[in-house]
Amino acid sequence: MSATAEQNARNPKGKGGFARTVSQRKRKRLFLIGGALAVLAVAVGLMLTAFNQDIRFFRTPADLTEQDMTSGARFRLGGLVEEGSVSRTGSELRFTVTDTIKTVKVVFEGIPPDLFREGQGVVAEGRFGSDGLFRADNVLAKHDENYVPKDLADSLKKKGVWEGK
């Protein structure tokens, strides 16, 4: 029996070995491409999860959830320093951050920025303590008398309390 007759006997539809290997190569290539895309999707998902805190510059008091207050995770709290809320005891500074809807009491150990004052924009970095107070380890104040963080200005505009430009 010749080689061609032997191939036809094993493959009754008349497809030769060459067609089978091309099909196998295509299938293998598809699996490789699919696998690479899956690995890429997982990598992008992990990167987005890792940078989740940095994607959003800060949260306003109204944006906070119960999980934010109990998880112990670090984040940035932004808003306005409420009028009449600033008090200092030794190196401890206490103040309230508001977005005119909700307020959050903040405790900061250290020297506040020179531009820190009541009624001005502020971003505090830290986490909630077991006592329910936001424990800031860094406080950022506005840069000049016209500066309010864009996210805060947008939030205040939506709520109808924005008086700036």
From Swiss-Prot:
A Pfam family the protein falls into: CcmE
Topological domain ranges for the Periplasmic compartment: 51-165
Gene3D superfamilies: Nucleic acid-binding proteins (2.40.50.140)
Membrane-side (Cytoplasmic) residue stretches: 1-29
TM region positions: 30-50
GO MF annotation terms: heme binding; metal ion binding
Major localization listed first in the record, in broad terms: membrane
A biological process term (GO) from this entry: cytochrome complex assembly
Presence of keyword Membrane: yes
Protein keywords: Cell inner membrane, Cell membrane, Cytochrome c-type biogenesis, Heme, Iron, Membrane, Metal-binding, Signal-anchor, Transmembrane, Transmembrane helix
GO cellular component, one term: plasma membrane
Membrane topology: Single-pass type II membrane protein
Compartments it resides in: Cell inner membrane
Binding site for heme: H143, Y147
NCBIfam families linked: PRK13254.1-1, PRK13254.1-4, PRK13254.1-5
Sequence similarity: Belongs to the CcmE/CycJ family.
HAMAP family registered for this protein in UniProt: CcmE
Biological role: Heme chaperone required for the biogenesis of c-type cytochromes. Transiently binds heme delivered by CcmC and transfers the heme to apo-cytochromes in a process facilitated by CcmF and CcmH.
Protein name: Cytochrome c-type biogenesis protein CcmE
